[in-house]
Amino acid sequence: MNSKNILIVGAGFSGVVIARQLAEQGHHIRIIDQRDHIGGNSYDARDPQTDVMVHVYGPHIFHTDNETVWNYVTQHAEMMPYVNRVKATVNGQVFSLPINLHTINQFFAKTCSPDEARALIAEKGDSSILEPKTFEEQALRFIGKELYEAFFKGYTIKQWGMEPSQLPASILKRLPVRFNYDDNYFNHRFQGMPKLGYTKMIES
């Protein structure tokens, strides 16, 4: 195979993996990035004062169902098991997220079975919204005003810097509601974080 000079734009996960694969095939690789470091949004570094590992662009938990991907990643870093369990404080009470059966029962002060919880959420939803076009409409249609205002509205404004009425409905489809007691934020089989950080993993 003829060796080629290849320019990779972007030093995040995708860029560095592609670069490594091509380099192992004998190509000459150059990587550029608009930032002055590798790792993309997963870049992390130790705080010099506290020695705490800081995810500079927000927390990242590696999660996948693809065993090939997991095996590839664990060749380059020791992964610490980590399950992301998210809590939210609403009106002085602590709730589990994603919304699950425990969240529903706690919020509405009920002891619903899974089927009863499904029926309750369906009842709370605004059935007059036939084709939701915005995040807000999707939430009101899917989970109703009470859960939307308690768990989604403020968080969404903070995350996106926009009113939910200005965001597309498709965003809410990524936020799960469960009718069991599973409070693991992700459903994937393999979950964890690199022991020495993402930057060290990518450098290897």
Segments and roles (model prediction):
Residues 4-31:
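N-terminal Rossmann-like FAD-binding beta1-loop-alpha1 element of flavoenzymes
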Residues 12-14, 36-38, 50, 102, ...:
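Short, solvent-exposed loop/turn segments at secondary-structure junctions
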Residues 12-17, 41-42, 199:
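Gly/Ser/Thr-rich beta-alpha loop segments that engage phosphate groups in nucleotides
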Residues 19, 70, 202-203:
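Short amphipathic alpha-helical segments and helix-helix/interface helices
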Residues 23-48:
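Glycine-rich FAD pyrophosphate-binding loop
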Residues 49-126:
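Dinucleotide-binding Rossmann-like beta1-alpha1 core, especially the glycine-rich loop
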Residues 93, 102-204:
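Active-site/ligand-binding neighborhood in enzyme catalytic cores
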